[in-house]
A protein has these predicted regions:
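Compositionally biased low-complexity segments at domain edges in trafficked proteins
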Residues: 102-123
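Single conserved hydrophobic/aromatic residue that forms the stacking wall/gate
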Residues: 1-10
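Beta-strand-dominated extracellular/periplasmic modules and repeats
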Residues: 11-96, 100, 107-109
Length: 123
């Protein structure tokens, strides 16, 4: 989520893996909000062919102690997979997480299928 240098962008990103297809979930829109106090959108991206963002979602003065929310718009992604319901079970996946030390590495991946999801604090 945070990058202090361009070379760190790949290492410090959220990413999304489609556990139904066994592939990176390319093309999913992801928004990030700060939710410490008033909820405010900070950034938005579309995941690339590797299921990753090409840019840091949080960096510089935006990356500070507080609570954040990632919103993955998975409904549009699953609507485009043949033989799945036209109305997806999951439309948006929201992950709320806290940053207690902005000097540490924060990586929040999403593993998602049409019916379930999981996340963890990655390395």
């Amino acid at each position: 989520l945070y990058s202090s240098a361009a070379s760190d962008v790949y290492k410090r990103q959220t990413h999304c893996l489609d556990t139904f297809s066994g592939k990176p979930a390319k093309g999913i829109k992801v928004d990030i909000y700060t939710v410490s106090g008033k909820k405010e959108k900070i950034n938005s991206t579309i995941l690339n062919n590797n299921g990753r963002s090409d840019k840091a979602l949080l960096e510089g003065s935006n990356f500070k102690e507080g609570e954040y929310e990632l919103v993955f718009f998975v409904g549009d992604y699953f609507r485009n997979i043949p033989n799945l319901p036209k109305i997806p079970f999951l439309n948006e996946v929201t992950i709320r997480f806290g940053v207690s030390n902005p000097k540490e590495h924060y990586h929040v991946p999403l593993l998602v299928s049409p019916w379930s999801y999981s996340t963890y604090r990655g390395s």
